[in-house]
Amino acid sequence: MTATSSHGARLTIDLGALAANWRRLAAEAAGAECAAVIKADAYGCGIAQVAPALWDAGCRTFFVAHLSEAERTRAVLSDATIYVLNGFPPGSAPAYRAMGFRPVLGSRSEIAEWAQACRSLGERLPAALHVDTGMNRLGLNPAEAIDLAGDAVLGAFQPTLLMSHLVSAEVPGDAITARQIAEFARVRMAYPALPASLANSAGIFLGKAARHEIVRPGYALYGGNPTPERENPMRPVVRLEAAILQLREVAAGETAGYNARWTAPGPRLLATLSLGYADGYPRAGSGRAEALVGGVRCPFVGTISMDLVILDVTQAPPEAVRRGAPVVLIGDGLTLDEVGQRAGTIGYEILTNLGSRYDRHYIEGSSLSA
């Protein structure tokens, strides 16, 4: 961090590590195409920067959630294949056609609407078929999907992919995962010529039965651990730092933060940092989160507020405790997954909520440590 930081907190995103993670996942899934999920503004890391970095690494197929995200991706990647996971809004088929987007269709009514739109446009436009194998969220049920295989409606457009989504691929030996793999294989028999996709980040590490022709990593690309029961095979991509705004000595019995929820058990040195829940750092981490000051873990005290947090830096090295000194909130061993766990959530939520107020710094070569 620099003293000229306009916010007082910096988010560093390592595009070199991102590309290395994609190559690592592509190698793990050798024989399948490795796509990339870049929904939610590339998991908070920025579509405009992330998508070209992945393209340069060799990725050619991208998945987003909404049409607006597809448009932002197309603005930086003119030749990429772009699937829209949440299907298509009524009346948007001309936009999909003009921009070359492929909706993921998950119901008979949506399929009928897409087919009718293709007839009206006079063109068999591409689309994916989504089968629900256990999530009960989006998708055709397996019986519907098998029945659909013989329906003339498929002749009105060009099916290019059969896909489903794993419920708990990160849980070793999970029975639901085994059932989903088997169910998807059964449905796929009705579509022998259609490329298929089932594996997410964790699914890539389940072996060939889950991979099929296309794998769809998301969280792991950005440094999240796809194998939480084992050491993380991915390189860290994000680093969050904030500068110390103010130092304050408090005596035993004094309180800090809203509602006086923390009381000093003895003399303490407190540091206030310029970030809070408005920046995506979860309020639920109050009293549970930690940050690194001079390499020493220091606890958050009091309630995390909108723009400020307070640390107990009593045990930090004296030379690291000064106004303007950097504090690490993600990085150097404080992982996304740990930050999420301490806040009672998951690393995905931490990553995608990292706010727009940070000074963002993109680097091409990996200099971040786990």
Swiss-Prot record:
Known pathway: Amino-acid biosynthesis; D-alanine biosynthesis; D-alanine from L-alanine: step 1/1
Enzyme class of the recorded protein, top EC level: isomerase
Gene Ontology BP terms: D-alanine biosynthetic process
GO terms assigned for molecular function: alanine racemase activity; pyridoxal phosphate binding
Binding residues for substrate: 137, 306
Keyword Membrane: no
Cofactor(s) in the UniProt record: pyridoxal 5'-phosphate
SMART domains cross-referenced by the UniProt entry: Ala_racemase_C
Modified positions (N6-(pyridoxal phosphate)lysine) in chain numbering: 39
GO CC terms, sorted: cytosol
Keywords: Isomerase, Pyridoxal phosphate
Top-level division of the source organism's lineage: Bacteria
Biological function: Catalyzes the interconversion of L-alanine and D-alanine. May also act on other amino acids.
Family named by the database record: Belongs to the alanine racemase family.
Protein name stated in the entry: Alanine racemase
Organism: Methylobacterium nodulans (strain LMG 21967 / CNCM I-2342 / ORS 2060)
